[in-house]
């Protein structure tokens, strides 16, 4: 099992942070364009799920998968979206995404007066702690197999 990448978006679609670990294929477009496409897809899926679900879904959608990867999604009450792409063998990781938001983003970005909110995260401490945390996950593989 492995982690491919992670996105953090604000409620306006600004990509606050992007990290990559075992991404085998690049999108072939500029990163800014990739971020816009990812956010647009998330917005559309979220809207579709809320309209089509026969039940009142308090959490909306949590993940979806293709034949190649699984996208895990977590949205906070403030509209921050945490998105992690993994291989298909990874089960539900809502608690992992919540931890990334609450214990890393809030602690090292939101509570840091030197980190302006609504802009790309510049904190090296956040980046290094995020990288260490993701690498410590049981489904993170040192080899992209």
Swiss-Prot record:
* Signal peptide annotation: none
Q: Which SMART domains match?
A: Sybindin (SM01399)
Q: Where in the cell is it found?
A: Golgi apparatus, cis-Golgi network; Endoplasmic reticulum
Which GO BP terms sit in this record? COPII vesicle coating; endoplasmic reticulum to Golgi vesicle-mediated transport; vesicle coating; vesicle tethering
Q: Which Pfam families match?
A: Sybindin
- Claim: Amino-acid biosynthesis is one of the keywords in the record: no
**CDD domains listed in its UniProt record:** TRAPPC1_MUM2
InterPro entries recorded: Longin-like_dom_sf, TRAPPC
Determine if Manganese is one of this entry's keywords.
Answer: no
Q: Name one GO cellular component term.
A: cytoplasm
The UniProt keyword set, sorted, is:
Endoplasmic reticulum, ER-Golgi transport, Golgi apparatus, Transport
Function text: May play a role in vesicular transport from endoplasmic reticulum to Golgi.
> Which family, according to the similarity comment?
Belongs to the TRAPP small subunits family. BET5 subfamily.
Q: How does it assemble?
A: Part of the multisubunit transport protein particle (TRAPP) complex. The heterodimer TRAPPC6B-TRAPPC3 interacts with TRAPPC1 likely providing a core for TRAPP complex formation.
Name the record gives this protein: Trafficking protein particle complex subunit 1
Q: Which organism is it from?
A: Mus musculus (Mouse)
Higher taxonomy: Eukaryota, Metazoa, Chordata, Craniata, Vertebrata
């Amino acid at each position: 099992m492995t982690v491919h990448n992670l996105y953090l978006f604000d409620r306006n679609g600004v990509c606050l942070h992007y990290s990559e670990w075992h991404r085998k294929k690049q999108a072939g477009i500029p990163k800014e364009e990739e971020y816009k496409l990812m956010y647009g897809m998330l917005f559309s899926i979220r809207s579709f799920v809320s309209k089509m679900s026969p039940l009142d879904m308090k959490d909306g959608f949590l993940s979806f998968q293709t034949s190649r990867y699984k996208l895990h999604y977590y949205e906070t009450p403030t509209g921050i979206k945490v998105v992690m792409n993994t291989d298909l063998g990874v089960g539900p990781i809502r608690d992992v995404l919540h931890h990334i938001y609450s214990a890393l983003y809030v602690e090292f970005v939101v509570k840091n007066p030197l980190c302006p909110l609504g802009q790309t995260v510049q904190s090296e401490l956040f980046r290094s702690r995020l990288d260490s945390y993701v690498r410590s996950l049981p489904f993170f593989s040192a080899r992209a197999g």
